[in-house]
């Protein structure tokens, strides 16, 4: 068993508590033995997680941010399964299937940041925000977050998602997908107009998505984005999230804090 996965599982077994996105779990790599893990979590489930992580590691070319996001997602998932009993074994396997599906679909795509981070880091990060900050434990919401850009940005049909993950997940993905046949400015305008009509699940995914993108702009913006363009994105993002129906107070506050911090940093 690799050390990172042992750390993830140990954190889930020992604490079951969410940590700050950048905080390392304060547990020893040896705080849970393999036999204890096998008894409490299931040996085959561990093997499935390791297989998914290996696939991701290969396609993401061992990108640090991507692998950290996966490990954080697994920490939250295993805590929900083992400690909270809020996710079933089948739910964990479905989340792993979602990671694998999204990883393959986004293979070769990168973010617009200067480091050209593998794109899969984004849906993983959105799912982590839902679980860590939003305390979301609904498996369909988590999987829809993992797949939220597959229809919009890859050659994926909703029917394919429905066949593998069900109509609920496909419906949520449809709700949060833009029509890429429209010009970018029109898509942004429609996001503002349509925000108030989103379901609570779609609203939560939108909040986590915007939170990830806003933080990414602060920490690793595209090289060709001017300060004015970043300002405009923050203004537009606020227009969208302010119109979303109430859905998750923790995520709403996190997005607002991010926006407020940005404008405070821009003050003369």
Predicted regions and their residues:
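Classical Sec-dependent N-terminal signal peptides that target proteins to the secretory pathway
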Residues: 1-23
């Amino acid at each position: 068993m690799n050390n990172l996965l042992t750390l993830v599982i140990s954190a889930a077994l020992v604490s079951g508590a969410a940590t700050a996105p950048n905080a390392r779990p304060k547990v020893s790599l040896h705080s849970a033995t393999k036999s204890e893990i096998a008894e409490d979590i299931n040996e085959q489930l561990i093997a499935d997680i390791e297989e998914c992580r290996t696939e991701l590691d290969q396609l993401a070319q061992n990108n640090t941010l991507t692998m950290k996001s996966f490990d954080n997602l697994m920490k939250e998932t295993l805590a929900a399964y083992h400690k909270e009993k809020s996710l079933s074994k089948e739910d964990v396997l479905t989340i792993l299937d979602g990671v694998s599906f999204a990883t393959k679909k986004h293979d070769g795509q990168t973010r617009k940041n200067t480091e050209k981070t593998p794109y899969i880091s984004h849906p993983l990060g959105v799912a982590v925000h839902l679980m860590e900050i939003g305390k979301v434990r609904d498996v369909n919401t988590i999987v829809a977050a993992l797949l939220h850009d597959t229809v919009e940005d890859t050659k994926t049909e909703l029917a394919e998602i429905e066949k593998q993950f069900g109509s609920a997940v496909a419906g949520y993905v449809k709700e949060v997908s833009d029509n890429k046949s429209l010009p970018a400015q029109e898509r942004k305008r429609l996001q503002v107009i349509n925000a108030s009509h989103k379901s609570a699940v779609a609203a939560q995914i939108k909040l986590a998505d915007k939170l990830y993108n806003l933080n990414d702009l602060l920490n690793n913006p595209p090289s060709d984005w001017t300060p004015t363009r970043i300002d405009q994105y923050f203004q537009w993002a606020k227009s969208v999230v302010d119109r979303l129906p109430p859905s998750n107070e923790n995520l709403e506050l996190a997005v607002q804090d991010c926006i407020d911090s940005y404008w405070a940093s821009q003050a003369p």
